[in-house]
Amino acid sequence: MERTENLKKGEKGALLNIFAYVILAVVKLVIGILYHSEALRADGLNNGTDIVASVAVLIGLRISQRPADSDHPYGHYRAETISSLVASFIMMAVGIEVLIGGGKAIAGGTTETPNLIAAWTALGSAVFMYGIYLYNKRLAASIKSSALMAAAKDSRSDAFVSAGAFIGVFSSQLKLPWVDPVTAFIIGIIICKTAWDIFKDASHSLTDGFHLKDLEPYKQTVGRIENVHRLKDVKARYLGSTVHIEMVITVDPKLTVEEGHGVADEVEDKIKHEHDVTHVHVHVEPDDIK
């Protein structure tokens, strides 16, 4: 129940992102086109992909709230990971389009100097998006949402991209018009890099990948439990923002079945309490070490 409430809180951050990105995308695209800034136009297209990514996060958070059923005995938590994967494809497509546009402008030797209005628009956007990043970062940390944290990091990247657009446009005022399309090209690279990072993390999670170093805290917790002789095996996987763990422990072979079951319950309770894990399955075996 607590996890569902946290997912609902996460929707606020996703909705805030959508609202902010819609406004910024429209403003940047209009000003970028009217005042001849390739960098600001690229930044606006970047925000357009962010709208899609934020909508995907919102949809994923809502689907993830559905309870487990006969077809999904572990719940629907992976919906937010799937939505992130879809968003990464769209972001990559737009990033490539920006790269092509910036590359053509560089090759064409553009001499058109953007208006300073484009520079101030980019600077204002950078400050605004960094504020959005700080808000969503705090919210994501409080509700332990990896999807919202990823969205927050994307907002931080957007702030840096907008700052880069400001530098590009401002440099054009110093009789360096080539800096603007070069900045647009760099923005395209940043969009593609962000898309790749999201794709890599989402695909790793969906294929049940789990970094070995992240298992250490769980091993340390089990190691402190008195009646556990050995942690024979431990595996974990992500289902959305939740963690599911399976482990095999050994206990004194003289323990009764009921006592062994009690040790397993103690392990489950400590793992869930100390690490906010959703599901823990513990298999108990008699210790055969003499």
Swiss-Prot record:
One Gene Ontology molecular-function label: monoatomic cation transmembrane transporter activity
Family: Belongs to the cation diffusion facilitator (CDF) transporter (TC 2.A.4) family.
Name of protein: Uncharacterized transporter YdbO
Subcellular location per the Swiss-Prot or TrEMBL entry: Cell membrane
GO cellular component: membrane; plasma membrane
Chain ranges passing through the membrane: 14-34, 82-102, 115-135, 158-174, 176-196
Keyword terms of this UniProt record: Cell membrane, Membrane, Transmembrane, Transmembrane helix, Transport
NCBIfam families linked to this entry: CDF
Pfam families on file: Cation_efflux, ZT_dimer
InterPro entries, per the entry: Cation_efflux, Cation_efflux_CTD, Cation_efflux_CTD_sf, Cation_efflux_TMD_sf, CDF_Transporter
Main location: membrane
Name of encoding gene: ydbO
Membrane topology of the entry: Multi-pass membrane protein
Coiled-coil segments on the chain, per record: none
